[in-house]
C-alpha cells in the first residue's frame, strides 16, 4: 500500500474521491437502481457513501481491504444505527457468491487495483444486466511519462487512464455497454468540509504526505481530472 493510502486510512478521510460525498449523492440520485436492489460498495473507506445508502433503506454491503478503514466504517454504522454487513477483502478476491448484487459502486478504487482481476470479480458478483458505477481518476490529456510515473508512484495507482481508455477497458473485460455521466454544479448539494476520523497515533511523516498530495494536485491540475462511468454486465 502506498504511503498516500496509508495516510488516508490513518486520517480516516471520508469521501476521498473526486467531488466527495456531494458528488456521490448526485451520481447515485441519477444512476442508482431501485431501493430494493442490493448494492456492493467496493472499497468503502470510512463508509460515508454506504451509510447514505443505508439511510435510504438500500440493502447495501461493504468491502475494503484496509482493516483500519473497515473498523472506522463499522464504527460509523454502529453510531448511525445501521446494520450494514462489512467484509475485509480485496476487489480481486470478493467473498460473495456469483450474481449477488444489482449494482457495484467503486469510488476511486479501481485505479489502485489489479484491473484484470478486479473487473472480472466485479462482473462475477453482478447479476445479469447489473451495473458498475465508477468514479475514478482520469487524465484530461496525455501526461508526459516522467510526470505520470511520479503520480503513479506517489499515489500507488496501478493505472492512470483518459476517460476514453476507461470505456475501452471496461468493454474489453466483458461489460456489454458503458455510459459516461457528467454533473452540473446545480446537481450537487452543499456538503461541509472533508470529514476525518483520526487514528490515535499518526507519524508526522503522514502530514508531509498530505502536503505533497496538495502540491501535486496543484502542480498537475492541467492533467488530472476524473470520470464517472456506468458499465452494464
Curated annotation (Swiss-Prot):
EC numbers on record: 2.1.1.-
Tree of life domain: Bacteria
Keyword NADP: no
Gene Ontology terms, MF aspect: methyltransferase activity; S-adenosylmethionine-dependent methyltransferase activity
InterPro entries on file: Methyltransf_11 (IPR013216), Methyltransf_Superfamily (IPR050508), SAM-dependent_MTases_sf (IPR029063)
EC supergroup of this enzyme: transferase
Ion transport in keyword set: no
Keywords in alphabetical order: Methyltransferase, Transferase
Signal peptide segment: none
GO biological process: methylation
PANTHER family named in the record: METHYLTRANSFERASE, METHYLTRANSFERASE DOMAIN-CONTAINING PROTEIN
Family designation: Belongs to the methyltransferase superfamily.
The protein, known as: Uncharacterized methyltransferase YodH
Organism: Bacillus subtilis (strain 168)
